Amino acid sequence: LQEDINKVDWTAGYAFAAYREPDRKIVNSILDETKTDLPNYYVSDPMRYYQDLKDHGVSLAANYEHKFTVSDKFAPVLDGGVYGEYKSRTFDARRFGYNLLGKGYDRYADWDYAGLFCDENISADRIWMRETTTNSDSYTSENILGAAYVSAKLNYGEALNANIGVRMEYYNLKMDGYSSDGTTPVHLDNRTSDFFPSVNISYNLSAKHLVRAAYGRSVNRPEFREVV
């Protein structure tokens, strides 16, 4: 291709993100307001949480530009391109809670956390662990985005500047999981095709004054975390 008339460029990318939380310990402390001498707290709803999240993303884009020379004042530029993107996510979590309703110990004693969960207090009649994981704690999701655009720069001398274009996008979002109570399977498969035109025209009345008109249409697409 003639470099002063045509330009071609392309980009490819891959992204991977992982987040693992092996053992988050959660303890709620409740203040006993009946005692006025020293603050006395007791433990409520302790929990251990494990999380594993993996994201993969692949993208590919290509652009083409061609310059025309019609006259000294009019040299339009035509642009076009395509873009493709694929993303996937897997999310798994497990939850474990402690049953504190046993009768073989004083739940409201002035324990520190290490003392409360000591080996002597862990048994079937005192404190025991139970899994509270539900189906809603895991899901898989993926999306596909395909786009193509064409635009033209139609400047005439130094007085008129005009840019017009349109972009077409195809978007497909899929997700498999469960409702928040973990009982109802949820399968999401959203497909949309949209056109996004844009126009930007300005006319220079003088070195200090110009008239401008512009129009554009865009969209904000949800992230995985906003869908779940």
Language-model features, listed with the residues they occupy:
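Structural signature of Gram-negative outer-membrane beta-barrels, strongest in the C-terminal barrel
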Residues: 12-13, 51-61, 67-228
